């Protein structure tokens, strides 16, 4: 069987190599987006995540409104067959919402991954990041020792206690880790051999 596999690889090629070859253009886009994001302030970089979330909410809102309208029509009905057709309509709208959000996530993948990579770089290069405090920062500061609030600023330390052991962030994502993240985003299984 291994002889046959070798012959097939010679003529057809190695599937994993082909798959990887298709992912590296996305990795290049992540690097390009990271360069652009490196010019942003800490607050501007954080705002990118909110921008992503708001756009997802904008995609979902009209569809969820439509689902709620269909649900209210269902409540007014007693005919089981009519209800069944409306439940099928809800399923169709839910699938549409999922598909539209998935398309948006695929579209922003390079920039979203770049936000994470740039954030990791900033934590690696700085002992502390100072940002405008948000309600989330205030909540986290009550339970996490590496987040402090001073006036209207949140101070995020790059080291913290993990089960009694001090840990300092010292990593920026390698290309192979970006590839692994892309593969997982695509719903595939990835085995990291690093």
Feature map (PLM): residue ranges:
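A conserved P-loop NTPase coupling/switch region
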Residues: 1-16, 20
């Amino acid at each position: 069987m291994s002889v046959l596999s070798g012959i097939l690889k010679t003529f057809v090629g190695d599937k994993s190599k082909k798959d990887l070859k298709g992912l590296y253009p996305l990795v290049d886009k992540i690097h390009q987006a990271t360069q652009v994001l490196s010019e942003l302030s800490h607050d501007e970089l954080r705002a990118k995540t909110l921008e992503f979330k708001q756009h997802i909410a904008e995609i979902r809102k009209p569809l969820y409104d439509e689902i709620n309208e269909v649900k209210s029509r269902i409540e007014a009905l007693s005919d089981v067959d009519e209800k069944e057709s409306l439940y099928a309509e809800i399923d169709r709208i839910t699938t549409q919402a999922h598909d539209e959000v998935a398309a948006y996530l695929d579209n922003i993948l390079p920039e979203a991954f770049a936000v994470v990579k740039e954030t990791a770089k900033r934590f690696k290069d700085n002992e502390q990041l100072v940002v405008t405090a948000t309600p989330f920062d205030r909540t986290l500061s009550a339970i996490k020792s590496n987040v402090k609030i001073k006036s209207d600023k949140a101070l995020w330390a790059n080291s913290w206690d993990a089960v009694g052991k001090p840990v300092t962030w010292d990593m920026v994502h390698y290309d192979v880790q970006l590839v692994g993240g892309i593969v997982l985003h695509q719903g595939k299984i990835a085995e990291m051999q690093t």
